[in-house]
Amino acid sequence: MTAPGQWGTFLHQCLMHRIDATEFKSLLKLMFQKCPITETALLDALLQTRLKSRIKWDPLLPLYIDCLCRMGRVRTSTVLTSLLKYSSIHEDSQPLVPAAKEGSKGYTLMTDIRVIQDAMLSVSTGGTPKTIAEAIAIFFSIIDWIHAVVAWHHSHLDHSQHPGGLMSSPDVVSVFESLGILLAALSGTGKGLEVLSADSHEELKVKLGQALSAYLPLCVEVSLPLRNRLDGLQKEFHLYGEPSSKSLNVPMMDNVNVNALQFEASVMDGPVIHSRAGLYVYINAMLVGRPLVDDSMLINFLANRYGGHYEVLIEEIITAAFDVLSNAMYRNESSRTMFLFRSFLVNKLPPFFAAMLASTMVSIPMEMCISQALGRLDPNTFPSFSQMFEMQGNTVLSDVRQEFLFACASHKLIPESSIERMLGENPMQALPVGYNKDELVSQINTNPERAEQLINEIESMEGNAGAIVGAITEIMHNLCNQKETVTLKNICNSLSRRPQALDVILLFRSAKQVLQPLCGLLDSWHWDEDQGENQPVYDEFGSILLLVLAFKYRFDLRPADLGISSNDSFVLKLLERGSCSQKLDALDEKQNKNLGTWIAALFIAEGISEETMSACSPQEFYLLVATLFSQSLGACETGKLEFDTLKGGFEYLLEPFLLPSLVFALTWLGNHIWETEPEPSIALKALHSLVNPSSISGEGREIHRTVLHTVARMLEEQLKDVRTRHPSRTDIKPIMDSLEPCLSFQRVGSCHRSELEGWTTHAGGGLLGSIRSTFQALVLWSANPEVSMAPPSYTHRQVVAGIRMLGAARVFGALVDELVKLQTQTQTQTQAGSSDLALDLAATLVCAPLSEAFAVEQNSHHPVDPSKEALPRCAVLTLRDALALQHENVPKLAEKDPLRAEVVVRLARRVAALLAPPSQVPNLDVNNIIQNMQLGIEGSGPMELDGPGPAADDDDDAENIHRMIDNAAAAAAAAGMDSGVGVGVGQGTGLDTSIDDVLNAADMAVGNPEFLDLDMEGMF
């Protein structure tokens, strides 16, 4: 039997036996060893199998294709090309190849939609393309698909019917729309932009222009915003289906573009003006989600911005911090956000200023700087104590000025006696006791209970948070080194139940500085079966792990953020696979024995004994939790275990020493419910009993709340989807009600649905138009002489949403549009001076930190050792990247739009000046600041299967394949679990609905309420 024949038999058997994705991957390894095959032949075999089955929709098919892509066996471009070859889109229109006729009776569009959407997801998340060649190949595949869909439209036009053509088939509309989104997503990637920006791909751009010219007129009926987006793409890269009218013969000298040098030399810079909105935006960006505060980076930025003018620097950063608080109050931001802004002002800035004073030889009149900054504030927003009784409005910020001044006095920036004069009245509090980090460390070493007392004070507004954070993190490091886990457990418990304390910690330490020692301790945890009592060991291990998980889920941290550098790390394995169950035959002998022991302890014996725990280390237990739940729930669903017995066994996991394992158990359970199409009643009852337990201890209740915080958002999204599929169910709402108080746990910079709808429906052009409008308001505010005027409404979530949804290139283009407009107005003397303010604001936006790129930016100030750690990488195109691309394009841009080219050059110069390396900082020793003031001190894969022996005779091939498939199916049945690859997967729960949400959320009519929390962030 030929290789395609063997593969055809294998794939047919997989589909017939409903082999799930995990087992399919394992079987693929065997097949590739036994029978190598090219990617085109492999896809032909798979798609021909689909045609033979005559099934209109089989969710396994796109799942198998996705597995092949993820394993690197096939490329996205080849998938799209092969998919088109066998697509029923050719029906009643001229087929591209004869092969299509063979399946003309089969209906493939539902599969086509799903595969195209999977390709779009891979592109939007950075999975592909990895090379220029692959990007070009995907562009050509999209072009062919567009022509096929347009041909289908014309062949189905019937003027006697309405609607006709494209609009007569919802599935064809979905294919059409998905292709447009895929094209937009690909064009927003780094490789896609390189292809479209280069001069060497003229043939591709001509064909792409022809495809767009055919696509855009039809797109008006489908989605006007998508049409506008692709129209902008066509205009930006001149994709009109015709060869370029002229080639640029640019003179080169030693690989340097002479025209570019000449043009840039002719561009004159205007005066450097520090807009009030600049630092206002920068601080918003630092604190909008995970606190992105790195002292070296901040000092460097401020020193570059202000040079040696420290008085101006201090006055403006104080003013900006108060402006941020004022804006948050008027925007009705959450109390959690208000707390973080307030802590930055009161707890972060005073010691930060003290560090600057200690490191510079320049005398800085702090009292004058602070007085001038306070004089610029709106008295209605920050009233004095006496004014509080006269004001009818909001006085939530009445204490802030006083708190800030006392914190400054505590850090010796101003004398205590000057506070009354600066406030204009008698203060209503006394000077707090100032803390010293080293003294606090000594106190904790003497009395470990002092640590919890100090943690209680982290959230206070007395200017001591920095010293407390420094002491606590140093103690944690020491305890990790000494493996003193009893005290460490208590500290971790105190921190994990205080989410706001985690925010404050990141004002002074990076996540890596805090978590790397903890992850190292968990990875190297020593387990001795004869060590005596085991429950306390499980308790200590779980408490330390729970703090790591709280940080990870609150701030959406990546392994590099946690300080994990080894692929063998237990924590890494747990984060990647802890919520995935395993088949029984995939477990080794020790794992099988441990699983049986735990099942017996939970459901048969009187409880969890010391023998149960002594035979299984905490690391082994946590990696088995999902499988334990899978087997137990599977037994209950098949009638082998009573539900009351199941519930009683699961309740043992509510004991404090096992509670952290529920993070992975609930994650698995949520996925199982989402994947279970026919009847999820038992799983929902189990979930309700764990989310809302009937009884739990006081200590357990605190840990349980932290567990729910980490999983609530994911569970809510899954339950919403299940409720949509089963609207008559009444057992879902009680669970969602219990989760509701925990939904605000994350701080990742995502916007709210109401915000997104307001921006995307903006009359001036959707989300981009709203960003431009906000930019205009910030420039106007900076130019206004009324210095006490309240700041305009602003949240950096708007810019982040633009970057994640539309792409940095389009957001950057909108900023440049505004700069060009203001430059034109300046030349006509209608808006003199505003263009320089706008340039400063735009440069600050480009320099502002972004969570996706923060590790890369930090690496320029704190380089990692490449021999020990992988260099950090950024998964999205940032505003800095977009500026760099535009700057490279200046020679061509100067010929078509000289004014725009000038603006890009000026902006690039300003950004380069603001981001100049630390060595260029005058009169400021950054290392001394960091060291002296203790600010930011650095302190297994998929299952392997044995390959087959010598190749069997052809006559035995089919029998061998059948036996292999039968064994896999039998193993799946023996495991007693639903693989989640039934008909329900992909129907109403996958990208079929969220594709519309992507479009609607980005300039569209309706948005997904949790859109920015999805994995599709950054698609455009």
Swiss-Prot record:
Main location, first listed in the record: nucleus
Taxonomy, superkingdom: Eukaryota
Keyword Transcription regulation: yes
GO CC aspect terms: mediator complex
Subcellular localization(s) per the UniProt record: Nucleus
Keywords annotated in UniProt: Activator, Nucleus, Transcription, Transcription regulation
Any GO BP annotation: regulation of transcription by RNA polymerase II
Pfam families given in the database record: Med5
One MF annotation (Gene Ontology) recorded for this entry: transcription coregulator activity
Subunit (UniProt): Component of the Mediator complex.
Family from the record: Belongs to the Mediator complex subunit 5 family.
Protein name: Mediator of RNA polymerase II transcription subunit 5
Source organism: Aspergillus clavatus (strain ATCC 1007 / CBS 513.65 / DSM 816 / NCTC 3887 / NRRL 1 / QM 1276 / 107)
Gene this protein is translated from: nut1
